[in-house]
């Protein structure tokens, strides 16, 4: 629809003749527009979005002649009533966290499983987490009391590229929330237009009093708003917000994984340092044994076979030492990469694996749902999928758009920004899809199935999390028992070696018996070191399985 506005400065008789006329009808035809132009009226191009049918108010110069399709008061009341409808409840199902099965206590602590309904007393997506004082908090790696590990861990948060990538992904998701929320508000635009126009002197209904050349100065603004009657926009905001929270949880999970991998690699490296030191000490002992055997052979007190056996054992242990160096270099490179060091110059001086293994506070299984970021991410993704159902359902309802324009138009700069040059209009449009061959039904069903799939993914993440904790607990329990047995084996092997070595030096036994005893001692000592290193790595695995001190209250609101 075109809008007709006064340009001013026309004969009074023309204004009287036009009084009460329906300008909008005349503006629809070329002849009518020409007639209006001849009487000092201007037809503006519609500045509303395409397809919008606005309610127009028309006025002639001086405001004498006017045609109002609807009473302005009634229109404003109707628009206000429509605006109030934006507070209606959004269509589609409201979200509640999927049900899950949680044990009362972990199996490794000796309690049975019970079915727990999804805790949601306040109607929110999460129950309030109440971590006890004994729970892991913040820099959990500090419980190991290793300052070099602390320095490496602290570097991750500021330098790791993978973590920065996760941060940028979260920030992009957060921006999507802002973009979705902006759709709740009107859009505003404004701009001037200054043109000089010439019309044909031979146009229909022209007169000698009608100018053929004139200026057209327009300053106009417009506003457009889609009231969220059915909640489509609110559901979009809900989906974007849940997706952003899922992204934040995934970022926390990346951070947890990196810190845990750093600690695991570090303790594995320290275990190899201990293995290397053991092998170096063994090489020194075997070199002494070889020298002794060679002297005895030269004195006729031992055989050449004993010398060969001593030489073989020495070279075997030297080869093992080289192999440990290969594995250590790989862990050192992995640590340098995680901490974003230049691995061509990065190095960690050898040091023994020291300190008692710290106790990791468990909490109760129901708290695990609030403490693991991967569970939080899966749950938030389920929320986002649920919101998509509401978006799909809203397609069954009409789309309503409100619009308004206002400004000034004149042929004379001196009268441009004045009351008689003002123009304004209000409009509304409702669009309802009548036939889509079942597309909306299909999209709604798709959204529901997507939600169910995401809900099952959440449940699977929960079950896998409990398995992860139980695996780490059982590993720690078994390794602790194995460490005790292995210490006894080391003590027995040490005693056997001492006896054999003394007997050999006293000429009572052959070197083969010493060699057998020393091989058994080396194997048991190496096994003991490996068990201790695995216990530290399993301890880190338990920390990771428990969420590393994170909890769902850290999600952005």
Regions found by a protein language model. Give the residues of each.
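Intrinsic disorder/low-complexity segments
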Residues: 1-87, 117
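Terminal intrinsically disordered/low-complexity segments used for targeting and assembly
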Residues: 84-158, 206, 217, 241, ...
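Small/polar-residue-enriched beta-strand and adjacent coil segments characteristic
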Residues: 93-98, 105, 138-139, 144-155, ...
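Periplasmic alpha-helical coiled-coil/stalk elements that build and connect Gram-negative outer-membrane
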Residues: 233, 249-364, 475, 479, ...
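A short glycine-centered flexible hinge/capping loop motif at secondary-structure junctions
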Residues: 297-301, 504-508, 545-549
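Alpha-helical heptad-repeat coiled-coil segments that mediate oligomerization/polymerization in large
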Residues: 300-303, 465, 472, 507-511
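Hydrophobic, well-ordered secondary-structure elements that form the walls
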Residues: 368, 402, 430, 447, ...
